[in-house]
């Protein structure tokens, strides 16, 4: 927040003064490549006045620009490893045409205009999460980003596609070696390549293990994150049992019929059977129960 404030006021530190220029140029190149980023608000937990609260928050421009620099680093690292035929890339398969067709039908059902000639990336970039129907479409867009994983190689490139469909480029993780295991391996391999030396033996010996290790790690991290958010929501709502809240149904699982809805204030996301309701619809929900020890909240539709 401070960096964005300083940039807006024209007093940014020289080390970040050019970040908006570089970030905007990278965003333009992303558009030209056919890449796409989902502008879904993230849910945050904030300590405030001796208590906790939750909020939905979209990234600041400076955060988007910083992310573009990280992506640029990962793309450059990926090209180094592909050129040396040793390393590990972050991959994402392209969405199946029928999945895009289903998304187009969903947008039509929600009353969100998607011109026939407009590509999927261009359509997604124009969606506004502040509009309930468009937020519902954005939530459904996440289904097109499934299948992300890692592909390792040593000595020759695999026949599988090494691209990342959302970025429309080859990409790897190298910017967070202290919190993400794969970055530790990828960054050391890139340092060796840059120095004209062979990749470290210890890194090469474990390359084939990394994709499954990272898959397991990501599953555990997501479960932990969801549990923390659930507990924070229960803390925020523990004194409000019986209250009715305005909410938006943002998604419905086509198989189970379970709906996901968002309450703006306090920022809560929970589930209820949709019972035939369509995504994008405004609903009123009642908080029936809070189980703090389990981090569980129970809602029902208000009459």
Regions found by a protein language model. Give the residues of each.
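Electropositive polyanion-binding surfaces
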Residues: 1-281, 290-297
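Short, compositionally biased
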Residues: 299-303
């Amino acid at each position: 927040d401070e960096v964005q404030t300083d940039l807006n006021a024209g007093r940014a530190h020289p080390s970040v003064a050019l970040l908006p220029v570089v970030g905007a140029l990278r965003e333009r190149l992303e558009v030209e490549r056919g890449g796409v980023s989902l502008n879904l608000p993230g849910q945050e937990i904030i300590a405030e006045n001796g208590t906790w609260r939750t909020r939905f928050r979209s990234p600041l421009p400076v955060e988007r620009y910083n992310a573009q620099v990280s992506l640029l680093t990962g793309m450059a690292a990926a090209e180094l490893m592909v050129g040396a035929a040793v390393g590990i890339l972050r991959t994402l398969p392209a969405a199946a045409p029928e999945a895009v067709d289903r998304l187009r039908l969903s947008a039509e059902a929600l009353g969100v205009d998607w011109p026939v000639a407009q590509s999927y990336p261009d359509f997604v970039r124009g969606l506004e999460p502040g509009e309930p129907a468009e937020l519902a479409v954005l939530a459904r867009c996440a289904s097109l980003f499934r299948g992300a994983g890692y592909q390792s190689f040593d000595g020759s490139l695999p026949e599988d596609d090494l691209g990342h469909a959302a970025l429309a480029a080859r990409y790897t993780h190298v910017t967070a070696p202290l919190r993400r295991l794969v970055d530790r391996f990828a960054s050391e391999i890139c340092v060796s390549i840059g120095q004209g030396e062979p990749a470290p033996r210890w890194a090469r010996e474990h390359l084939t293990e990394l994709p499954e290790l990272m898959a397991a790690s990501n599953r555990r991290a997501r479960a932990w994150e969801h549990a923390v958010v659930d507990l924070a929501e229960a803390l925020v709502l523990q004194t409000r049992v019986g209250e009715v809240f305005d909410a938006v149904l943002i998604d419905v699982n086509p198989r189970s019929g379970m709906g996901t809805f968002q309450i703006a204030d306090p920022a809560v996301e929970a589930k209820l059977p949709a019972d035939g309701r369509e995504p994008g619809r405004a609903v009123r929900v009642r908080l029936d129960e809070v189980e703090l020890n389990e981090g569980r909240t129970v809602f029902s539709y208000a009459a």
